[in-house]
Amino acid sequence: MTPTQSAIETAQPRSRLYLCALVLLWLVIYVPGLFAPALFDDADSVHAEAAREILLRHDWVTLHADGIRYLEKAPLLYWTIAASFRVFGVQEWSARLPLALGVLATMLAVFALGRRAAGEKAGFYSALTLATSLGIYIFTRILIPDLLVGLWLTLSCYFFFRILEQQKPSRGACWGLAAAAALSVLTKGLIGLVFPAAIVFLYLLLTRDLRRLLRMRLLSSAAVFLLIAAPWHILAGIRNPAAGEARGFFWFYFVNEHFLRYLNQRVPRDYDTVPLLAFWALALVWLAPWCAFLPPSLARAPHRRRDFAHALDRQQRAGLLLAIWAAVILVFFSFSTRQEYYTIPALPALALLVGGWLAQESEGSPESPRLRRAGRMSALCLFTVGIIVFVATMGLLMLSKRPPAGAELADLLKRNPEQYALSLGHVFDLTPQALGWFRGELAIVGLGFLIGTGLAWHTRRRNLPGVSNAALALMMVAILFAVWLALQKFAPILGSKELAVAIQRVYRPGDVIVINGEYESGSTLNFYTGIPVRILHERSANLWYGSFFPDAPQVFETDASIARLWDGSTRVFLWTDVRDVPQLAAKPAFELAHSGGKYILTNRRD
């Protein structure tokens, strides 16, 4: 048996062991979140409702929400959710299943790229880093497509890395790159093409290898890309031409939702943007706790011009490619409007950088002593953060007060609606009284950080980096479990499922459901009841543009129209925030239900 054959036979069982460990980790962290909490108002339930209406209308081209055209998003996420609904029925868990499987697919893609670039241990540590990072978990609690963009970018870079290893790039590698870019376009729009194209071009430019582009089967790859990406765009344009006050699909989707959004000129202006410094800082927070190892990981990537002038080995090529990948995303959004989660597609690249470094640190290479010194320093910094987190959480526990008997969490929050355009805006609502609801979760986070980072530092001091990494991974399992528990307690604030269930119990055909505010503020009513709702608000947000088409249902109510409806013979269920109870007509209002600081009022007792 040759040494190569022996290495392959040894690697295969190790690879299976790594993959089994990763799948088990995914099951423990991500599967419980399929079933709880309930879907949230805004993007979570709006996107689930758009998928439900695909099946309701048998229309896989034009998305709808509340019966109105919903043209601002690319369709792939909605297609996967609709397919899940068709197979498993319309359920919370079936709505979340595609995104959870997307996490697993991204973990496996990261493993494959890391293994190809730096060996199986690097692939394993990279996928471990991704699976246990804070940002990936938080932003897959909501049905948004950014994680899937990270998946397609990982596959794009995997195929491009194969291209770099081939003197004459194969059809499979070139077409795989084109297909991944096309799927990314169908997931998030034009950035699905801009990101991989920029990464490939900048890499070849820096390494003075632009001639490789001519060998990348550009014509056939473009055909593959267009075959996948173009049909939906063409059909959407044909099915949604300019009509009435609406300027059609192409203007809204490409001009308004891509170019004007990037330039902060999009209409309507119903969004906020994260400050630039916070945006970059949050990219590190989302990689926590593994961001502590990012500085030495980045230091190993080629970063001087003279480095690019020489032939790079496999790990150097990977380091440069991954650094460019992360930089393209962070720099791109530095010049546009941005949300906290726009950095998510960069996290696989950062996880791969960290995973490759962790693998080298744990191996007995000549560089290991220097790497382990850097690892001990990073672990010490992390332990310092762990102490700070522990002290802060213990301080919050001391400040927190046990909630009064019978009190709701909503009663103890301080509302900050000006922050709600940000995805994590409700965090600013917490008060010392409200923190009393989260004493257990705070204890888990504080003790978890202290014990986990302390063990990580202690074991690295004893030259046991593998044990140290395991301690950090287990720490994150506990912390993410605490996040899941906290979200279940916060769910009545973030969603309106209990109110939808209360309506369903007494609903009769002909009754009318009205949301006092924007559609997104109570969109779970639409999803959980399966009944179109009306909106006591001017045209705005997700339904703004679609409402201008002549065939759009008249769902927007005015004060005058709601007064007539309220005083008529029709039974009306009015969703309203406790802060904004409207002045209704002559008939009295009766409370049907309340939850999370929101009420369902009705004009009839029966």
Question: Model-predicted segments: where are they?
Answer:
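Membrane-embedded architecture of ER/inner-membrane glycosylation machinery
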Residues: 2-7, 171, 175, 300-606
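Membrane-integral, polyisoprenol-dependent glycosyltransferases
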Residues: 2-370, 396-400
